[in-house]
Regions:
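Hydrophobic packing positions in regular secondary-structure scaffolds
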Residues: 1-54
Length: 54
């Protein structure tokens, strides 16, 4: 699954489901997928992922 398709699919999931998937990815995969999302979505997920790792 390429990052464009993954970003589209993840964007359509409920937030908690999306976060479970995103936090399980490698940093490289995560960066590639976030880069394909809207800036707003990427920022939101990045903030929530960072908060969950504190």
């Amino acid at each position: 699954l390429d990052s464009v398709k993954a970003a589209k699919i993840i964007s359509q999931l409920k937030e908690q489901e999306a976060l479970k998937i995103l936090t399980g990815l490698s940093k490289k995969q995560l960066a590639e997928i976030l880069a394909k999302m809207t800036p707003e979505q990427a920022a939101s997920y990045t903030e929530k992922i960072a908060a969950s790792q504190e």
